[in-house]
UniProtKB/Swiss-Prot annotation:
Keyword terms of this UniProt record: Cytoplasm, Elongation factor, Protein biosynthesis
Pfam families (alphabetical): EF_TS
Name of this chain's protein: Elongation factor Ts
Gene designation per UniProt: tsf
Subcellular location: Cytoplasm
Region (Involved in Mg(2+) ion dislocation from EF-Tu): 80-83
Length: 282
């Protein structure tokens, strides 16, 4: 005969998210004591998590949030797409976003030993281990990003494919252009720019592009070569620089043109301060 009630079993499952059989075993081991059973399962979780750490994690989700505390972006990987869409896993990821906003940290190593916002009795790494036990797969917090936010900034977030790709755009100079920032973020996910503007293209990347173009126009007069290089570089900048790209929702205007229009209508100098584009595994 069991030494615990069905109500205790139900509470243990609710508190830990662990399966029925393991909860029964834990309560039997702890003589029906709920608190001890919770601790027992957490210890088991830490032990079983270490056995899963070597497994590949190619699936996952990217999540982001922006509020008065700042902007946080996290990428968390698991083994299968099935678990990537699991409610327990998604709750863990959402909690991580809150943790980054609360602690204002910018590295995974700095985040892991901090107290979890989801369970004050656990560190974030310990909660990761407990969640691994619940979902049965390795969980890896791959990268995090925290951006402070001023009162004169607008932040727009766009998520594609249920968190497979996420973009964040920060506009400086104005606090009420979240819709524009989100439109630009949507454009970024579709167009995938590498740099903000011409000036941010690394010199070595620019030289490589010039060499490629030059090799294609050998034998022509230098004046012709220079004109061709100039034209092709313009196309190159349109391909890789956000501000040079034609807006995906209205190709008649560039992203720079959108920002310039925002400056005119707001009476402030609006600029794209920063953008982020993360894709799972990239």
């Amino acid at each position: 005969m069991s030494n615990f009630s069905m109500e205790t079993l139900k509470l243990l499952r609710q508190q830990t998210g662990v399966g029925l059989t393991k909860c029964k075993e834990a309560l039997a081991e702890c003589n029906g004591n709920l608190e001890e059973a919770v601790v027992h399962l957490r210890k088991l979780g830490l032990a079983s998590a270490s056995k899963k750490e070597h497994r590949e994690t190619k699936e996952g989700v990217i999540a982001a949030k922006s509020d008065a505390r700042g902007t946080a972006v996290v990428e968390v990987n698991v083994e299968t797409d099935f678990v990537a869409n699991n409610a327990v896993f998604r709750t863990f990821v959402d909690g991580l976003v809150e943790d980054v906003l609360n602690h204002k940290v910018n590295s995974v190593d700095a985040l892991l030993p901090l107290t979890s916002s989801q369970d004050a009795s656990l560190t974030i790494d310990e909660l990761r281990a407990v969640t691994m036990q619940t979902v049965g797969e390795n969980i890896r917090i791959s990268r995090i990003k925290y951006l402070p936010k001023t009162t004169e900034e607008s932040v727009g977030i766009y998520s594609h494919g249920n968190g497979k790709a996420v973009s964040v755009t920060v506009l400086s100079g104005v606090a009420d252009k979240e819709s524009l920032a989100k439109d630009i973020s949507m454009h970024i996910v579709a167009a995938q720019p590498l740099f903000l503007n011409k000036e941010s293209v690394p010199a070595d990347a620019l030289e490589r592009e010039k060499e490629v173009i030059s090799s294609q126009v050998q034998g022509k007069p230098q004046a012709v070569i220079d004109k061709i290089i100039s034209g092709k570089l313009g196309t190159f900048f349109q391909d890789v620089c956000l501000l040079e790209q034609a807006f995906i929702k209205n190709p008649d205007i560039t992203i720079q043109g959108l920002v310039d229009d925002a400056s005119k209508t707001s009476g402030n100098s609006v600029e794209v301060k920063e953008f982020i584009l993360w894709k799972i595994g990239a």
